[in-house]
């Protein structure tokens, strides 16, 4: 909820109680956006106000009012608490150990929160559109995930790599989230269990794959990052460069100052294989060279030797951890293409084969590029 909004306690004709932002009751939903910016779809009815929806169902009365800040902390039950994933301690499939140790799971931790503002300073929950109450799903979206981490909300991530529901999701298991049949089943379930007020069609901007045209879904997965706590060292290097035009220096510093940790992994087959090996105790080891990899390898070196450090050859190599002695396999991830771009001064100047030659030519005297994207792309990765 938004702590600064006023909410009404609405009693419908069947005696059910609903909480809604007061200003949302008579709000003409999506009316302003489609008058000013977009074209409404021909033949599609305009959206009804919330007040109109309840009047058509037999009417309603307002039996009370409450401030959003007074709702924070309320506990509630949710429509899908019967699914096994909701009973997994610490969340599912990525477990929050601290919450698990406290015996917390999705089913027990539904509570009203005030998510505050986004990174632009705008309220995440607003009056007007919708109900004024937003369900936060930390396992299913970027903003929700950030709020979940900040406020310690249990994360439930339901989808696999094919956007199908995984084992812990009961009657949804194996069904593709974007299939209309799946959507209809979910809507039907909500209706049968009296969790749905109304269904309407409306224009909605939604991300699609630029190649296939398929709908995209958010999916919570573990990734690899370069910690940017050492950003000050990188920023100091900017002053060692003569920028033409001169304002390029400040532009690059602005980007570096606000840059979060750099995600360097991709869930793909093609790409530079990350030299990271994982072990059954949850530890990992970064291999620094082919020579070190050969020294640590206990299996698969003969399949890899003489080939480029890419999949599938490098994936065959298993190593023994130099400290624990555990046997590990390489992570399946490959590197972000901009990670490749950042090592151009090493890969093109023979760093691995001829250090003297590399030292002669590194760093470059002159880099020519077009603006503006390179500040957050190639210049950044080079630095």
Give residue spans per PLM region.
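Zinc-coordinating Cys/His ligand positions in small cysteine/histidine-rich zinc-finger domains
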Residues: 21-22, 340
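Residue patterns forming the tRNA-binding/recognition surfaces of aminoacyl-tRNA synthetases
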Residues: 1, 7-8, 14-16, 23-25, ...
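Short, surface-exposed alpha-helical recognition segments that flank or form part
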Residues: 88, 94, 104-108, 247-254, ...
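Conserved active-site neighborhood of enzyme catalytic/cofactor-binding cores
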Residues: 11, 132-138, 163, 255, ...
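Conserved oxyanion/phosphate-binding beta-strand-loop segments in alpha/beta enzyme cores
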Residues: 56-124, 214-237, 323-353
């Amino acid at each position: 909820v938004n702590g600064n909004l006023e909410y009404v306690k609405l009693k419908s004709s069947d005696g059910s109680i609903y909480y809604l932002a007061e200003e949302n009751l008579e709000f003409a939903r999506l009316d302003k956006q489609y008058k000013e910016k977009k074209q409404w779809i021909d033949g599609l009815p305009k959206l009804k106000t919330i007040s109109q929806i309840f009047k058509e169902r037999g009417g309603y009365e307002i039996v009370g009012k409450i401030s959003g800040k007074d709702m924070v902390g309320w506990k509630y039950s949710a429509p899908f608490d019967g699914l096994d994933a909701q009973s997994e301690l610490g969340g599912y499939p990525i477990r929050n150990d601290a919450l698990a140790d406290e015996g917390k799971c999705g089913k027990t931790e539904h509570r009203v929160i005030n998510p505050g503002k986004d990174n632009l300073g705008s309220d995440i929950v607003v009056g007007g559109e919708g109900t004024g109450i937003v369900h936060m799903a930390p396992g299913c979206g970027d903003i929700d995930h950030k709020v979940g981490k900040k406020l310690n909300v249990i994360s439930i991530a339901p989808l696999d790599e094919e956007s199908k529901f995984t084992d812990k999701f009961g009657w949804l298991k194996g069904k593709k989230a974007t299939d209309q049949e799946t959507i209809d089943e979910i809507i039907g379930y909500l209706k049968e269990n009296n969790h749905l007020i109304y269904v309407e069609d409306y224009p909605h901007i939604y991300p699609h794959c630029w190649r296939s045209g398929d709908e995209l879904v958010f999916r919570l997965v573990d990734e690899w990052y370069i910690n940017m706590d050492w950003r000050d060292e990188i920023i100091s290097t900017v002053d060692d460069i003569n920028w033409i035009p001169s304002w390029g220096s400040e532009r690059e510093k602005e980007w570096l100052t606000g840059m979060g940790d750099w995600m360097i992994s991709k869930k793909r087959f093609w790409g530079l294989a990350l030299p990271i090996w994982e072990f059954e105790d949850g530890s990992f080891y970064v291999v620094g060279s082919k020579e070190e990899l050969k020294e640590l390898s206990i299996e698969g070196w003969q399949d890899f030797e003489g080939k480029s450090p890419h999949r599938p050859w490098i994936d065959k190599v298993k190593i023994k951890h130099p400290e624990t002695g555990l046997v590990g396999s390489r992570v399946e991830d490959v590197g972000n293409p901009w990670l490749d771009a950042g090592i151009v001064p090493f890969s093109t100047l023979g760093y691995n084969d001829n250090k003297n030659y590399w030292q002669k030519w590194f760093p470059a005297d002159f880099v020519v590029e077009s603006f503006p994207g390179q500040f957050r792309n190639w210049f950044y990765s080079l630095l």
